[in-house]
Amino acid sequence: MEQLHFINPETALILVLLSSLLFAVIGILYSRKYRGYSNYLTAGRKTGTLSLTSSLVASALGAWILFGPASAATWGGIGSVIGYSLGTAFPMIALIYLGKKIRKTFPSGITFTQFIFHKIGKNLFKSILLLSVFYMFIFLCAEVTAVAILINYISSVPLWTPAALVIATTLIYTLYGGLRASILTDNFQFLIIIILLLVCMYNIFSSDFISYQDITNNSGNLLSGKYIPNYTAGLTFFIAVAATNLFHQGNWQRVFAAKNYEVLKKSLKLSFLIIIPIVFFMGITGIIAISVDSKVNPDLAFFSILLKDKSELLYMVIIILAISLTVSTVDTLVNAISSLIVVDGKKINENLKSSNGLVILLSIIALFVASKGFSILYLFLLADLLCCAAVFPVFYGFYKRNLKERDLIISVITGLLLGFLLFPSPDFSKSILVGILLPFDLFPQIVTSSLLFWSFLLATLGPVIVIISYDSFKRR
């Protein structure tokens, strides 16, 4: 990725350090008044509507929104924008119903894996525990890498420096204060994120180089109902993003942290309504960017139009926005991983120490990945596939009493096998079935050009068909 070097490295580092330290100080000072495992893991189960809403939104919106939606829109069109928006927000609606079920069954619960263990069985519990930790670790790497690349892009600061500052300051207050600290800092980060996004929105839409006519003339296909990727990309992002977020323990922690179910329900509805327009706006900037410059780097689509005038103030806004987005997500991930490890053990005190050690180790690995600028997109897609295969069996199992653990595991394996047959190779040119087992020419273009879509679709629908067929067979 090219570098702008518009802000000198010292200024960029000062902004990163001050922003990160601000959240660390707030988190530590607040947490000193609220000690104990209940506050650390569930924030005392006393979180109100405004606080819970802002925490849910801030946790859902990481630095990925600065890159992902706009990049996808440059080739996936308006469909990918809608899919990304709904996929990010949909878990909030799903948690209204799933949250009610799990809070009623386990009023003193902490993790969703507890429910799986008691309701379904030990083997599926272990698999989902590993899946959840794997997904959140990949998410952690992606967030730290994204902010490191962004700061490097606009100021030439070495990748490891902002990554180390963000990880270190976040770990300090998160491992000390737990969920209480995370939710409080989320409240501040939410306000900063909303204000700075409004600043970005105003600057983009008040620019004289953007017009609807230019967009329709230069990128009309991205808005067309006849453009197939509008549908395949939209469904791909919806399925993948929605499925993975249901396995995000950070969301489930907030389900248990709500003061009562009415607070939870209202907060989730508000979060849904706030998330959709934010992600939609970020996606639309990709369509605008590609219409202004057909050769734009997709990963930089949002920045290419926001920073077109090279305003130093806007560069500073971007740095503060990126840090707020990253820290809000990283502290959620750290808390979530820690809670899974703690609750899985019998002795909470000993497990809290071991969980902190493991979280620090994972953070060091994430720092290494970020310092090298490695792309972990393929691992992210792999985690998406695993979640797609597991999402229906696991959450359907929340409600069905007569389903055996063995049958649910078989359905997950079926989904994985079907998904892996069409899961694209690292260069996205072929899959196990298309191009390896069978010749490429045997398949229509709609399959060969959208392998990821068909992979996710089969991984999701395969278990549904298996379970429904099994239910029908048992009724005979």
Located regions from the model:
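Membrane-embedded helix-loop-helix hairpins and adjacent transmembrane boundary segments
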Residues: 1-476
